[in-house]
Amino acid sequence: MKVMVVGSGGREHALAWKLARSPKVQVVYVAPGNGGTALDKRLQNVPITDPEVLAAFAEREGVHFTVVGPEAPLAAGIVDLFRAKGLRIFGPTRAAAQLESSKDFAKAFMQRHGIPTAKYQTFGNAAEAHAYVDREGAPIVIKADGLAAGKGVVVAMTLEEAHGAIDMMLADNRLGDAGARVVIEEFLAGEEASFIVVCDGKDVVAMATSQDHKRLLDGDAGPNTGGMGAYSPAPVVTPTLHARVLREIILPTIRGMEKDGIPYTGFLYAGLMIDADGTPKTLEFNCRMGDPETQPIMARMKTDLFDVLDRAIDGKLDGMELDWDRRTALGVVMAAYNYPDTPRKGDVITGIPKETEDSVTFHAGTTLKDGALTTSGGRVLCVVGLADTVKAAQRAAYGAVEQIQFDGAQYRKDIGHRAIRR
């Protein structure tokens, strides 16, 4: 069968890589793909981003189903468009994707359905937002209401930072429409974890747990990024906590969406904060797999992803269980010079090691032109190592990272430090 993955990042490369391993899959189209998907003989890049043209392509080629990687096409309604044409697609509708595309929608939804989260208020007026922050004090969290490519959250440790974030979003309009309203919430302390499930509208199956590293620099210093590395499983999510998250957060979300007349089909990612007592609260929802969490999760997944998504699209996930490699997978992101500001493009990449049983490299910001692989975006590669312990997986990943060269490459040297400390 033919399947299609929409997107061009490391997450999409990992999804396409996993789908291509299914005996039922003849070809995986990746639209538009990247340099890594271009190099893989089992994958075929399709230089299309327009949803209407993609739908026509899927129809013409007899694509069995399409899976959407990034948030922007989901928020723009690609699922609604494909479904209206009778095409099978995995992802939430535009209305359901508001769980990610509007922070205010998500917070109001959680409050309405009793899902644990931080207290908050939403503002469109800078003066009112400044007054609220002065009343509440710091630390405090300022979030752009709309999609801001992972750059719309400021964890302000001082009042000065909080006021600066409000001005940046509401007064200076630096995030455009995404920052036309801000959600201001209480600061939650603890350890973060990513909890991702596959939903079919009624039932869910949980993906392996994971934990990512948002900050640019070692020791969780420097600015926030889209993510500099991740590992799976996340030891902070114990079996007891896993059951609690499903019971208190995931299932009430799926039931709540159904109750509100917006049934949720697709990947659902709950960003969690686990406090010192082991109590989970929801920081955010994403309507897709995380990046870079997808890369280590796919490296560990033993179940055929084609079967999982095929059943989810048909609403038949009930009773399905997933099988996982017992090893830890740890992914290190290699980013371009000057990321996360204005990353440099066009640096030649060499030395990417061949895939082995214990390491695989997923591409993100790469382009293949005239046989040369060059950088084309902020996060360039995610190098995944697999081993029996976090420490050994870390060694496997960094062993591969050290073989790869491109000018200005930057990466953290401590991915997995929280798990190793435990």
UniProtKB/Swiss-Prot annotation:
GO terms for biological process: 'de novo' IMP biosynthetic process; purine nucleobase biosynthetic process. Its EC number is 6.3.4.13. The keyword Ligase applies. Its cofactor is Mg(2+); Mn(2+). Mg(2+) binds at residues 284, 286. Residues 107-314 form the ATP-grasp domain. Binds 1 Mg(2+) or Mn(2+) ion per subunit. It catalyses: 5-phospho-beta-D-ribosylamine + glycine + ATP = N(1)-(5-phospho-beta-D-ribosyl)glycinamide + ADP + phosphate + H(+). PANTHER family: PHOSPHORIBOSYLAMINE--GLYCINE LIGASE, PHOSPHORIBOSYLAMINE--GLYCINE LIGASE, CHLOROPLASTIC. Belongs to the GARS family. This is Phosphoribosylamine--glycine ligase. It comes from Ralstonia nicotianae (strain ATCC BAA-1114 / GMI1000).
